[in-house]
C-alpha cells in the first residue's frame, strides 16, 4: 500500500530543492514516486498551486489529494477554520475517499503556515530514513499517511446493504397475500434493478483495480531496469507488496460480486 507524503518547507527555494531530492531518491531506487505537486501559502493564508501533478494514471491520486487539500485549506475560510461550504465539503469528501483522515488534513493545515511551501506526493518506500534524511537536511517537515482502500470498503458495504434489501423483499413477497404482492412487486423490481447496477459497479471497480495494479507494476519494472543491485531488491519487495495489496482489495470486491450474482440468479 502506498503512502501520501506532504513535506513542508520554510520557503519556496527549499521546496524546489526538496522536489529535486525526491526525484533523486526515485532514480536511485530508494522509493518510487508516483506523482508530485508543489503548493505555497501566502501571507494572507491563501494556498496556490506552484507546480501541478503530471497527468496520467500514476498521478491521478495525487491530483485528487492536491485539489482536495487546496479546497479545504486554501484560504482563511477552510474547513479547518470552521466553514462548511459545499465546495469545501466536496473537497473533504474527495480526500476521505482516498483514505486520508481529517486529522491528517488538520496536521497539514497547521504545519503549512503563511509563507511556507509544501510538496504533495504519493510514494512507495521500503524505509522512511532516506526520505526523512534528505528532507530534514533542507529543513523540511515530513507528514505521512497511508493511502487506504476506503472506497472499496464503502462499495462493498453499499452492495451488501442493497443485497440484504433485495433478499428481504423477496422473502416478504413470497409470504404476502395477493393484494400485498401487487404493492410489493414494484419495490422488488426496483431492488433487483439496483442490485444489477451494483453488480456492474463492482465489476467495473475490479477491472479498474486490476488495470491500476498493472500500470504500477510496469512502472516499477521500468525503475528496476536502471537500478543498482541493492535497489533492485527493494523494488522487488515493493512489487510483491503491491501485488498482495491489490489481491486483497479485489478479493473483498469479488466476494461481494459473487453474492450479487447468486442473489440475482436465485
Task: Describe these PLM feature segments.
Residues 2-11:
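Short, extreme N-terminal segment that most often corresponds to the first beta-strand
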Residues 3, 34, 115-117:
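Envelope-exposed proteins and targeting segments
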Residues 25-28, 107-110, 132:
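A generic local secondary-structure boundary/capping motif
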Residues 53-99:
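Short, low-complexity, glycine-enriched hydrophobic/amphipathic alpha-helices that associate
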Residues 84-124:
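Membrane-engaging insertion elements
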Residues 110-169:
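Amphipathic, membrane-inserting segments
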Residues 166, 170-266:
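Heptad-repeat coiled-coil alpha-helices
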